[in-house]
């Protein structure tokens, strides 16, 4: 444990989530005192894995906070030097996108930032955004194209295609930048792509489910290319962006862009006996891969875990947590 951060108090919202759980673990390991918010501190599925973390007994405090309840974060944020706002829903099957995704992302972010504006101790906010807020603007993404932090997703363009998660992250990040400019808050954003790697929480999350589907008997793999990144690298990037005084703006996090066919190929090499999908879900040409700039991530001092290792860690974790019966 690093002793240099003792007395350094930070808040993590949505602490029971996939990225946030790792963030809490790494912050505790580095000596921080963590004030963590969850929707229900009495739900063992939300908090048991957090209270068992090394250092939790001494330096982790849990608070109940609802994203949509005005002022719910005021008392938690008071006295904090840093706030990591990770809380935002991520799932695809939505009936009411406004209520299920957009309101919690947008209003929730502004609610947390509003509390930050009232806290004189606050030095910096790190916002968990997404590559979803960067790369979806109708511009072609082909192998010679490099997506970087100057790209902004076009929310209207995405709403027409019912990409509601993408819309929610885009509107939330746009509103956050506007708010922090007006209120003179120092904020940086972390914009990861598809996050995989080991699970600390007992509940299956959306991005790990993408790997689970491939190893649990799917007949086909999706015709899609995504950026992939390890959850531990994402959590680490949040802390580096907080600690590194010169960090600013947005930080895309992608170790590699790979088509699902490539992910299946890696799985086949790692686990030759697995029943894996042989064919693509459609007969169209494969959606091309593209590049994502690593410059901003490098400026934080971040080193990436290779995709092969991340995939293996994900499968081993899914086995250990009994999601996959291999």
Curated annotation (Swiss-Prot):
The keyword Iron does not apply. Coiled coil: none annotated. Changing residue 136 to F: Increase activity with sinapaldehyde as substrate. Strongly increase activity with sinapaldehyde as substrate. CDD domains: FR_SDR_e. SUPFAM superfamilies: NAD(P)-binding Rossmann-fold domains (SSF51735). The active site is at 169 (proton donor). This is Cinnamoyl-CoA reductase CAD2. It comes from Medicago truncatula.
């Amino acid at each position: 444990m690093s002793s240099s951060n003792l007395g350094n108090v930070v808040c993590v919202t949505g602490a029971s989530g996939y990225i946030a759980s790792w963030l809490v673990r790494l912050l505790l390991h580095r000596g921080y005192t963590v004030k963590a918010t969850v929707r229900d501190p009495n739900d063992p599925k939300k908090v048991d894995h957090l209270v068992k973390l090394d250092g939790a007994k001494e330096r982790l405090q849990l608070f109940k906070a609802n994203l949509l309840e005005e002022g719910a974060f005021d008392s938690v944020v008071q006295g904090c030097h840093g706030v990591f706002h990770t809380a935002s829903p991520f799932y695809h099957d939505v009936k009411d996108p406004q209520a299920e995704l957009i309101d919690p992302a947008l209003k929730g972010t502004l609610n947390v930032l509003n509390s930050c504006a009232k806290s004189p101790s606050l030095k910096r906010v790190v916002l968990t955004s997404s590559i979803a807020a960067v790369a979806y603007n109708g511009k072609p993404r082909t192998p010679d194209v490099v997506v970087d932090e100057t790209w902004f997703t076009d929310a209207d363009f995405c709403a027409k295609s019912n990409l509601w998660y993408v819309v929610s992250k885009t509107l939330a990040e746009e509103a956050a930048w506007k708010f922090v400019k007006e209120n003179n808050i120092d904020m940086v954003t972390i914009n990861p792509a598809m996050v995989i790697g080991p699970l600390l929480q007992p509940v299956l999350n959306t991005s790990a489910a993408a790997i689970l589907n491939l190893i649990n008997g799917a007949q086909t793999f999706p015709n899609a290319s995504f950026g992939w990144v390890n959850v531990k690298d994402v959590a680490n990037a949040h802390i580096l962006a907080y600690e590194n005084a010169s960090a600013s703006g947005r930080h895309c996090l992608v170790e590699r862009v790979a088509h699902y066919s490539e992910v299946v190929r890696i799985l086949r090499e790692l686990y030759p006996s697995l029943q894996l999908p042989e064919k693509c879900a459609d007969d169209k040409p494969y959606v091309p891969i593209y590049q994502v700039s690593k410059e901003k991530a490098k400026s934080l001092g971040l080193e990436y875990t290779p995709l092969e290792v991340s995939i293996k860690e994900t499968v081993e974790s899914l086995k250990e947590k009994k999601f996959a019966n291999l």
